[in-house]
Design a protein with these regions (language model features):
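GST-like domain detector, emphasizing the conserved glutathione-binding G-site
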Residues: 1-124
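Amphipathic alpha-helical packing segments from all-alpha helical-bundle domains
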Residues: 124-140
């Protein structure tokens, strides 16, 4: 298997770390969805990271789906999730908050680093900043 995407993405990074922690062998191909569009499109027309390429050429996208697959193929007893239903539910809740914080942080980067200054929306940025702040507040509670 090959994991495609750059480790500066929180979604690629969480997938990379999960595969390592589960002891699943994989190759990492560091391609940017911004700077390597033709190369990425040849692998995955969606140009979405992370992308997992199976040995048969099939492609899977979305870090949560890839991680679910990695958990499925991991050695018995190797799961990163707790067995207790209450602890499992809490871990899912924390993971959802972490993903929301990562997603909103990526939105902020797009708005402040990628979008031209004359096209930036201060109201949108204020909303995203509030969502980031509130999400981290929930994580720290």
């Amino acid at each position: 298997m090959k994991l495609v995407g750059m480790l500066d993405s929180p979604f690629v990074r969480r997938t990379f770390i999960t595969a390592r922690m589960l002891g699943i062998p994989f190759e990492h191909q560091s391609l940017s969805v911004f700077r390597n569009i033709p190369e990425f499109r040849a692998i995955n027309p969606l140009v979405k990271a992370p992308t997992l390429v199976f040995d048969d050429g099939e492609v899977m996208v979305d870090s949560s789906q890839i991680i679910a697959w990695l958990e499925h193929i991991a050695a018995p007893g190797k799961s990163l999730w707790p067995v207790d239903p209450g602890r499992y539910r809490r871990c899912l809740q924390l993971t959802s908050l972490g993903l929301a914080a990562a997603e909103k942080s990526v939105h902020r980067v797009y708005e402040t680093k990628v979008r031209p200054k004359e096209c930036r929306d201060p109201d949108w940025l204020e909303r995203v900043d509030g969502q980031i702040r509130d999400t981290y507040g929930l994580l720290e509670a």
